[in-house]
Amino acid sequence: MANLRTQKRLAASVVGVGKRKVWLDPNETSEIAQANSRNAIRKLVKNGTIVKKAVTVHSKSRTRAHAQSKREGRHSGYGKRKGTREARLPSQVVWIRRLRVLRRLLAKYRDAGKIDKHLYHVLYKESKGNAFKHKRALVEHIIQAKADAQREKALNEEAEARRLKNRAARDRRAQRVAEKRDALLKEDA
């Protein structure tokens, strides 16, 4: 058996793969041993005496299955954790995400006309001050604030109507009294 180490090295270089990916035909060892140049190796590659081996399959199915189960919440117990809670998900990042969600909601509501700019400003400051734990809490607060404003407006309108009614009654009474006085003065005269 001839030593074909050089031919294997040359073939790997010509084909453009590693030495372990080159197959030399064991029936043609004498012919391969004669090839001592890259050109000769190219000819052997062309006629199929030297062949580039296929890429070995490295399946990702197990990795995909593991990733899927991680998405479902598996493999995440205390035994699997290396970093601290803060290292795994910094509280700063959690805070930023939460605040961005709240601010986005406020801007959307303001642009849609669901809240006016004054209420927007108040709620913006409150959310910065950690008044709302999540989006639902903010939405509920907005609904409550709008209901309170509506109730207050209705009460104010009611009070204003009562004031106008009382003023009209006072005016009518004063007019009646003035008419009676005029009538009495006319009778006396």
Curated annotation (Swiss-Prot):
GO molecular function: RNA binding; structural constituent of ribosome
Modified residues (Phosphoserine): 30, 37, 91
GO biological process: cytoplasmic translation
Highest taxon, organism lineage: Eukaryota
GO cellular component, one term: cytosol
Name this protein carries in UniProt: Large ribosomal subunit protein eL19A
Localization terms from the record: Cytoplasm
